[in-house]
Each structure stands twice: as structure tokens, then as C-alpha cells.
Amino acid sequence: MSRVVVLDSSALLCVLNGEDGAERVAQLMPSAVIGAANLAEVVTKLRERGLSVEEVEEVLGGLPFDVRPLTSAQAHAIGHLRPATRAFGLSLGDRACLALAAELGLPALTADQAWAGLDIGVQVELIRG
């Protein structure tokens, strides 16, 4: 069985866009976890590119990952992460991924190079770099 990671939206978009690092992410996807907030970011990006509702559901429907809901505890953690991540320019979605990774004790997988400098008690793995 593959090791388990928490996917940032950038990791999933990397696969969908066929970017560098997509193979690495694709190998981890069958055992990966993604938060509902990060999945919403991916849906938003696909819709902004002009995909229809049906096309988005077709693209995402067959992907093998475990979607986790956003909990109240995660919402608080997202807010509490703001001071430590503000200088890195992390969005609410970025912090949602990190909060889920912290809650589950799993590494967060991202394409966002800005995460490399984080020191918040969550293991960050960069897809490229």
C-alpha cells in the first residue's frame, strides 16, 4: 500500500494539468486524502477554465482519493495558522490543507514552493524541488 499524504489543491491540479511532478502525485493518489475546501478550490479552477458542471464531475469523479469534510476543529486551526503563515502568503485553502495534515499526522503534498520555509509542525513535501 502507498503511503498516505494530504493533497493540496496544487497537487491535484498538477495531475489534472499534466505538469512536472504529476506522476509522483498520481502514484500517491490511491491512498491520498484531500480536504473538501481544497477540492472546492480545484472545482473552482476547472469551472474558471470553462468546464461545465458535467465535465468537472467527469474529470474528478473517477479519481481515487478520500475527501474529508471541513470540521469545526480544523476551522479553528486554519485561523490559528494565519499569524505563522501570513509572511509566506498562504491562502485559507493552503491553511485548510495544513490543518487537515496536522489533525491526521500526515505530510502535506504541494506544488507551492512557498511552503518550503514553513515551521509549523507539519511535514511538507514539495512535488518539485
Where do the PLM segments sit?
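Acidic, PIN/NYN-like endoribonuclease modules and their adjacent C-terminal/linker elements
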Residues: 2-4, 98, 102-129
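A general structural signal for well-ordered alpha-helical segments in protein cores
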Residues: 22, 39, 53, 75-78
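Amphipathic alpha-helical segments within well-ordered protein domains
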Residues: 43, 60, 79-82
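Short, well-structured N-terminal submotif of metal-dependent ribonuclease cores
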Residues: 1-34, 46-58
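Histidine- and aromatic-rich ligand-binding microenvironments
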Residues: 7-8, 34-36, 90-92, 112-113, ...
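Active-site neighborhoods of divalent-metal-dependent phosphate/nucleic-acid chemistry enzymes
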Residues: 68-109
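Alpha-helix capping/helix-boundary segments
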Residues: 11-12, 38, 74, 96-97, ...
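Short loop->beta-strand "edge-of-pocket" segments that line small-molecule binding or catalytic clefts
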Residues: 5, 31-34, 63-67, 107
